[in-house]
Amino acid sequence: MISLTALDLLDELLNDSSSNMIWLYEVYMLYKTYTSYFFMSSKSFVRGVKRYLIYFCYCANFIALFRVIFGTIFVYSPDGITPFMTDFVRWILIYLKGSINSLLYMASFTKQISLLRGWRTEHAELS
């Protein structure tokens, strides 16, 4: 029989791996867009992508800091908290972390689409 702790660790590993893959894919797509010659012809688009990459790095650093802070809180939690309460708080934080990751991913995807739409309208006006 597999213990519940092992399943928790596997669940956490899969969740972290999937969110990290989403972040890496987003950075790769931004880099590919930024270095593409087709998009380099518009200076405002290049400025927007640079600014977006900076915001993206800030969000990734915030999430990493969030994980480190709550990881240390769980390691150094007082013994007075019951195991049920610790598990309950832990699951709430895992849910919040997943929600924040999903919201940031959707926001970054929406921002990328709006940048592309802005570039298309600007490019159409120039032609």
From Swiss-Prot:
<feature type="transmembrane region" description="Helical">
    <location>
        <begin position="20"/>
        <end position="42"/>
    </location>
</feature>
<keyword id="KW-0812">Transmembrane</keyword>
<dbReference type="GO" id="GO:0016020">
    <property type="term" value="C:membrane"/>
</dbReference>
<keyword id="KW-0472">Membrane</keyword>
<keyword id="KW-1133">Transmembrane helix</keyword>
<feature type="transmembrane region" description="Helical">
    <location>
        <begin position="54"/>
        <end position="76"/>
    </location>
</feature>
<dbReference type="GO" id="GO:0005737">
    <property type="term" value="C:cytoplasm"/>
</dbReference>
<protein>
    <recommendedName>
        <fullName>Uncharacterized membrane protein C18E5.14c</fullName>
    </recommendedName>
</protein>
<keyword id="KW-0963">Cytoplasm</keyword>
<feature type="transmembrane region" description="Helical">
    <location>
        <begin position="91"/>
        <end position="110"/>
    </location>
</feature>
